[in-house]
């Protein structure tokens, strides 16, 4: 293969030692065999990889945390995977309340590092998700009602474009790229290498909670939760998880940036429902709050494959929607399957839908569901039940979260991005007119008028 540009960084071609390990993602259900993996150590390695790929007509997939929930999005047959997971510098500026992080950092590492320094970094429900992917897709989590989405806190970025050129974006320079990078999804505009976020002073202590009920009480708990969650105090983040009938239960957990006494009072409309089997509500130092909520979620030892789908609720689920949920939960078998809800509103809804690329600001709550399996022969039926459930719930939800993608969604652009999709296509046409960065659900460039 003749080329002007040499690959740099840690380079692993198909057939090299370490290739199979490089292929592994959080979801082990991958059947793709890239030509080469480049584990970039610095921004120049990323630029060289893009130039090499262009010179050799090789398709590109960027990869940050290996946490993509769909096959085909971070790997491609015969292509180059530009993996930035070794780029892990973190630089906190306490005086200005900002932090610069390289894109290889995982969310848990950043949140824990900053908590020790007395600052809040927003996070989701898994510590092993890469900061790149979660930021570019919006970045939801239990702190969003108090300080906004992860992407709402993004001030500046560094990206390598389709020509291998390093560009920066902030409110004064390439502002359209900054706008698109705050919810427009990864793998669309270039390979990102650095992010600058505003950070917030952490409280010395905060309250965490985890309440568990038997599975057969999920309907009454959900009805109470969805009535209460959208309008509760903005400082309270709440996640509700409902496992499969076979071996599952109901768990509500989250945090309140305030006292235990006040948390108990705020939680009562839900904790008084049914007969909880376990109830933990405790005041902790903020560093321990982060550890409590970010349980280990290793990437390379996952056994279960998954199919996910997601949406944003227009209003509380009526009985018909809950009946469809029950049918799903009675038929899925994997222990990691189920429904997950996150309360909305607060700081998320105070940002206008077109102010950033993340459009779905006015929902009542966020919902996702997934099936899980080990044996590849069970994949088809598990994928089918998730997508059939989406059809049943379609009347009650809008959109879908790009970080929890579903390749069963047709004409996915408006579903992920709402009315922001046309503008995102124009940004794509400006920064990647040749559609070098693409995947089965990426944003195509707008056609020239």
Give, region by region, the residue ranges found by the protein language model.
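Soluble FAD-dependent oxygen oxidases
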Residues: 1-449
């Amino acid at each position: 293969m003749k080329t002007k540009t040499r690959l740099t960084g840690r380079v692993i071609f198909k057939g090299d030692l370490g290739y199979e390990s490089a292929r592994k993602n959080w979801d082990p259900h991958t059947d793709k065999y890239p030509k080469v993996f480049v584990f970039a150590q610095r921004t120049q390695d990323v630029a060289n990889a893009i130039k090499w790929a262009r010179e050799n007509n090789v398709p590109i997939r960027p990869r940050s945390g290996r946490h993509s929930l769909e096959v085909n999005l971070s790997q491609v047959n015969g292509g180059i995977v530009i993996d930035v997971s070794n780029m892990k510098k973190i630089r906190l500026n306490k005086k200005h309340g900002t932090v610069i992080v390289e894109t290889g950092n995982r969310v848990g590492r950043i949140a824990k590092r900053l908590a020790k320094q007395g600052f809040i970094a927003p996070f989701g429900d898994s510590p092993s998700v890469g900061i790149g992917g979660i930021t570019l897709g919006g970045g939801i989590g239990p702190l969003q009602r108090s300080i906004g989405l992860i992407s709402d806190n993004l001030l500046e970025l560094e990206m390598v474009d389709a020509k291998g050129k390093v560009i920066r974006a902030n409110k004064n320079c390439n502002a359209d790229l900054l706008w698109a990078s705050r919810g427009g999804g990864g793998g669309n505009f270039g390979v990102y290498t650095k992010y600058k976020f505003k950070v917030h002073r952490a409280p010395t202590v905060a309250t965490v909670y985890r309440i568990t009920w038997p599975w057969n009480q999920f309907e009454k708990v959900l009805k109470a939760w969805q009535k209460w969650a959208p309008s509760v105090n903005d400082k309270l983040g709440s996640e509700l998880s409902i496992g499969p009938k076979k071996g599952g239960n109901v768990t509500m957990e989250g945090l309140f940036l305030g006292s235990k006494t006040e948390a108990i009072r705020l939680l009562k409309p839900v904790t008084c429902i049914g007969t909880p089997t376990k109830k933990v509500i405790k005041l902790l130092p903020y560093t321990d709050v982060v550890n409590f909520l970010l349980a280990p979620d290793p990437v390379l030892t996952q056994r279960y494959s998954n199919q996910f789908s997601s949406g944003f609720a227009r209003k509380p689920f009526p009985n018909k929607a809950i009946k469809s949920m029950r049918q799903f939960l009675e038929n899925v078998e994997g222990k990691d399957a189920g429904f997950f809800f996150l309360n909305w509103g607060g700081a998320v809804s105070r940002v206008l839908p077109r102010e950033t690329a993340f459009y779905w600001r006015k929902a009542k709550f966020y919902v996702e569901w997934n099936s899980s399996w080990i044996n590849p022969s069970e994949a088809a039926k598990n994928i089918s039940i998730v997508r059939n459930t989406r059809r049943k719930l379609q009347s009650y939800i809008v959109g879908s979260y790009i970080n929890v993608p579903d390749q069963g969604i047709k004409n996915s652009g408006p579903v992920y991005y709402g009315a922001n999709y046309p503008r995102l296509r124009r940004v794509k046409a400006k920064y990647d007119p040749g559609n070098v960065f693409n995947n089965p659900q990426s944003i195509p460039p707008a056609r020239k008028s």
